[in-house]
Amino acid sequence: MVENVIWPAALDANRSRSDGRRVSLDLAVENPTVDEIAKAVQQVGYDAVIERDKTYPREYEGRGRVVVKDADDATKSDLLGAVAAYMQALRE
C-alpha cells in the first residue's frame, strides 16, 4: 500500500521550485487549500485523508496536508499533475 503526501505548497503558484512547488506555473494555483486538494484527489479516483494538524517544514503557519491512499498505479508527479489540472478547472 503506497501513501503519497500532497502538501499545499506543492501546488502553490506563489512559491518557487526551491520553496516546495512541484508542478509547473501553468498548472499551479494560488493558495490551494487541503479541502480543494482532497476534492481533486477524489475526483481523480483515489482516496484522500486530510491531516489538518501537520505543517510543511518551510511554512510558518500550518495548512495541513492530504494523504493519498493506494495510488500504486501512478507516480507522484503524475498524481500532482492530474490534481493540479483538476484544481484549475474547479477555480475557473
Curated annotation (Swiss-Prot):
**Localisation:** Cytoplasm
An annotated GO cellular component: signal recognition particle
SUPFAM superfamilies, per database record: SRP19
Keyword check for Acetylation, yes or no: no
Q: Name one Pfam family in it.
A: SRP19
Q: Which residues form a coiled coil?
A: none
Task: Name the principal localization, coarsely classed.
Answer: cytoplasm
What does the record list as GO biological process? SRP-dependent cotranslational protein targeting to membrane, signal sequence recognition
Q: Which UniProt keywords apply?
A: Cytoplasm, Ribonucleoprotein, RNA-binding, Signal recognition particle
Drop me one GO molecular function for this one. Answer: 7S RNA binding
Disulfide connectivity for this sequence is: none
Its biological purpose is as follows: Involved in targeting and insertion of nascent membrane proteins into the cytoplasmic membrane. Binds directly to 7S RNA and mediates binding of the 54 kDa subunit of the SRP.
Similarity comment text for this entry: Belongs to the SRP19 family.
Q: Which NCBIfam families does the UniProt entry name for this protein?
A: Sig_rec_Srp19_Halo (NF041311)
Q: How does it assemble?
A: Part of the signal recognition particle protein translocation system, which is composed of SRP and FtsY. Archaeal SRP consists of a 7S RNA molecule of 300 nucleotides and two protein subunits: SRP54 and SRP19.
HAMAP family according to UniProt: SRP19 (MF_00305)
Its protein name is Signal recognition particle 19 kDa protein
Gene source species: Haloarcula marismortui (strain ATCC 43049 / DSM 3752 / JCM 8966 / VKM B-1809) (Halobacterium marismortui)
